[in-house]
């Protein structure tokens, strides 16, 4: 029996959505292959790496000469002693980037991460899995041919939505290794800490700095929408709170919004991704511009309005049967009616039942994804514990 060494690519230590994916991976492996060891790039803060019990690797997205091969010169016993994995130590690469490969992100990221794994590391002896994520489009020069290399080498590629599937099938319609599977953080069910019991049943606004970018006009429109949501949802008499899902940019938006309101609203800002998910899971309703905030709500059958910056928000609302609760920022006339539909759904037992049924279907698809991943790993690494 041997221990499986697994490198996780694409998970940022500074992003709660990414850390939820890490938590979901660790939880699932603890049930099926409890001896597995995980590694992330050594650029992670040491305290975070220690907290999650992770080994370190040389970052795959560094440019220039691939220094990771120099690590092979260090004796394996010493590498293990200091918690480092060289490329030859790694049995499995799991890419959990979420949304990082397509024209929006450019060719360099795709080449340095996915293509490098496919062409420089992948052999018949190891396993390369792209976990569910949004992918494409691949229209810019070099993008299609680069991703085709990944399609040719990866053992399994899971795309998170139908639009991504179209982008991938546009390159290779008959690929046997591509699956349509949802975001897998829907299988996490963290407990709400006792100290936060009073937030149960709150209405949450979850902002996202990516909604505004560098465009002042867009920033003004987005803040106007958040003001509209705060006014309308606050009028219900329910506890209303701003939830900071990610770092300083979202925090600044919360401060800026509160400065515009006649009465500032409470800000919930928990460092733990699991506690953040638990708060969302006991909400009455949410208005979310954070993708994993939206998943946390919908998976817990919490009615939600989506106000997002990419196709992935509309896609997930369609998956959960709530496309009528998707906001188009440009269509200001639809803001209030959509928010009214949200509050009606939140009060309506049948709407919640339908959402719970859709959530169960999505969880089944995530279970199917993991079943296929573990069947693949057991087939390719029969000696692993």
Task: Give the predicted meaning of each segment.
Residues 1-385:
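Active-site anion-handling motifs in enzyme catalytic cores
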């Amino acid at each position: 029996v041997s221990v499986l060494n697994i490198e996780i690519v694409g998970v940022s230590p500074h992003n709660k959505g990414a850390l939820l994916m890490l938590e979901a991976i660790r939880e699932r492996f603890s049930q099926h292959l409890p001896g597995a060891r995980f590694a992330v790039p050594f650029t992670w803060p040491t305290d975070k790496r220690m907290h999650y019990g992770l080994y370190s690797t040389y970052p795959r997205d560094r440019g220039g000469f691939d220094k990771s091969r120099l690590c092979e010169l260090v004796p394996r016993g010493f590498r293990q002693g200091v918690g480092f994995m060289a490329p030859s130590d790694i049995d499995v690469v799991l890419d959990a980037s979420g949304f990082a490969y397509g024209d929006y992100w450019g060719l360099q990221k795709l080449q340095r991460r996915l293509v490098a794994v496919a062409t420089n590391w992948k052999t018949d002896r190891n396993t390369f899995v792209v976990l569910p994520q949004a992918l494409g489009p691949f229209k810019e020069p070099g993008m299609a041919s680069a991703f085709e290399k990944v399609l040719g080498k990866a053992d399994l590629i899971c795309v998170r939505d139908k639009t991504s599937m179209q982008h991938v099938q546009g390159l290779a319609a008959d690929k046997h290794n591509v699956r349509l599977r949802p975001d897998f953080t829907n299988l996490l069910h963290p407990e709400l800490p006792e100290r936060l019991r009073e937030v149960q049943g709150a209405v949450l606004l979850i902002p996202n700095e990516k909604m505004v970018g560098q465009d002042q006009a867009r920033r003004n429109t987005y803040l106007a929408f958040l003001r509209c949501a705060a006014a309308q949802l606050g009028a219900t008499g329910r506890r209303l709170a701003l939830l900071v899902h990610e770092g300083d940019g979202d925090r600044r938006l919360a401060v800026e919004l509160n400065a515009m309101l006649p009465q500032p609203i409470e800000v919930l800002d928990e460092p733990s991704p699991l506690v953040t998910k638990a708060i969302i899971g006991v909400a009455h309703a949410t208005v979310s511009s954070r993708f994993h905030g939206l998943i946390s709500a919908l998976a817990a059958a919490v009615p939600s309005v989506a106000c997002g910056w990419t196709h992935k928000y509309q896609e997930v609302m369609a998956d959960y049967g709530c496309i009528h609760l998707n906001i188009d920022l440009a269509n200001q006339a639809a803001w209030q009616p959509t928010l009214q539909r949200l509050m009606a759904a939140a009060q309506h037992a049948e709407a919640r039942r339908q959402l719970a049924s859709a959530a169960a279907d999505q969880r089944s698809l995530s279970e199917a994804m993991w079943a296929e991943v573990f069947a693949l790993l057991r087939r390719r690494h029969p000696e692993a514990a």
